[in-house]
């Protein structure tokens, strides 16, 4: 018997890449799966129902149970329909994986309002809308699992991804809020920052040696490596794990730190700009975080 036997899981953006691998593994672990995918391009344009249908059919061919959904996570109504799909087909929902995403990379001073809004709405709004819709049912049944996808673009930083980084770090805060609001109902909420070669990653430009090197490393990492952690976090075995941020990089799993006070200074008479000029940098500089990008911080070769 699989670790998810009898559970119903909704996996957004599961027609391709990481989401597809999660949906397939959850089905093999016994879950009934709603395969949600709009079927759009990497930038979110267009739609194609065959993308979700192919994964649904693959699950059924292997003896599992699945339903396909083609709604967009980026609207309140779309998210409601995604969760309702689970209820219509399988009468409940136990697991929500917020995986759907798009990329519209652009350097800050060239990014358009549309490029900002599109990414924020898909990642951050989408994660909230779907979590909100699922939370109503989790509260009633006093159980549930929320698994969100963040990124080192938000946790650490990347050039040309102000929209994506903002959305992905916002998802960490959303996950923590979900964990706090729903802990009394036995609901957990965790984040995964994946490292894997997907069609979204393939769109990253390689205009300099550092970008090219990063892309070459990512090309060695399979989306399938991310699925086991998602399945574990969805299971009863992970009932005591909540509000954490994990990373998966090939055969390696990380636990990320979260913001906490690392140093403080005080003045009994109060601070002035002049006092801060004299004290703040000399006292705190050794604790400052460097301005690096994720590829500089996580620079060792992946364990393929």
Question: What residue spans do the PLM features occupy?
Answer:
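Substrate-binding pocket helix/loop in short-chain dehydrogenase/reductase
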Residues: 59, 107-108, 115-120
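The beta1-alpha1 cofactor-binding region of Rossmann-like NAD(H)/NADP(H)-dependent oxidoreductases
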Residues: 49, 70-81, 113
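C-terminal helical subdomain
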Residues: 212-304
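A glycine-rich helix->loop->beta "capping" turn
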Residues: 5, 62-65, 85-98, 104, ...
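Active-site helix of classical SDR
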Residues: 131, 167, 175
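Residue(s) in the substrate-gating loop at a strand-loop-helix junction
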Residues: 151
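Canonical Rossmann dinucleotide-binding motif of NAD(H)/NADP(H)-dependent dehydrogenases/reductases
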Residues: 3-35
């Amino acid at each position: 018997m699989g670790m998810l036997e009898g559970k119903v899981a909704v996996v957004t953006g599961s027609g391709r890449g990481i989401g597809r691998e999660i949906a397939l593994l959850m089905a093999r672990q016994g879950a009934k799966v709603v395969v949600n995918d709009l079927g759009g391009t990497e930038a979110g344009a267009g739609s194609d129902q065959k993308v979700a249908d192919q994964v649904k059919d693959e699950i059924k061919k292997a003896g599992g149970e699945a339903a396909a959904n083609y709604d967009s996570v980026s609207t309140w109504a779309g998210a409601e329909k995604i969760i309702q799909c689970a209820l219509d087909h399988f009468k409940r929902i136990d697991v929500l994986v917020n995986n759907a995403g798009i990329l519209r990379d652009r350097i800050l001073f060239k990014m358009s309002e549309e490029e900002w809004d599109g990414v924020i709405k898909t990642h951050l709004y989408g994660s909230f809308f779907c979590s909100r819709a699922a939370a109503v049912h989790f509260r009633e049944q006093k159980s549930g699992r929320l698994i969100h996808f963040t990124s080192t673009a938000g946790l650490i930083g990347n050039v040309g991804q102000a929209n994506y980084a903002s959305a992905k770090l916002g998802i960490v805060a959303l996950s923590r809020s979900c964990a706090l609001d729903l802990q009394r109902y036995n609901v957990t909420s965790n984040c995964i920052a994946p490292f894997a070669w997907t069609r979204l990653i393939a769109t990253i430009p390689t205009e300099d040696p550092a970008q090219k090197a990063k892309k070459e490393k990512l090309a060695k990492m399979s989306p399938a490596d991310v699925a086991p952690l998602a399945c574990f976090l969805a299971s009863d075995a992970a009932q005591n794990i909540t509000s954490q941020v994990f990373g998966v990089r090939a055969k390696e799993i990380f636990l990320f730190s979260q913001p906490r006070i690392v140093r403080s200074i005080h003045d009994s008479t109060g601070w002035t700009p002049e006092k801060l000029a004299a004290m703040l940098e000399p006292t705190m500089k050794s604790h400052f975080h460097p301005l690096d990008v994720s590829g500089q911080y996580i620079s060792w070769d992946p364990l393929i």
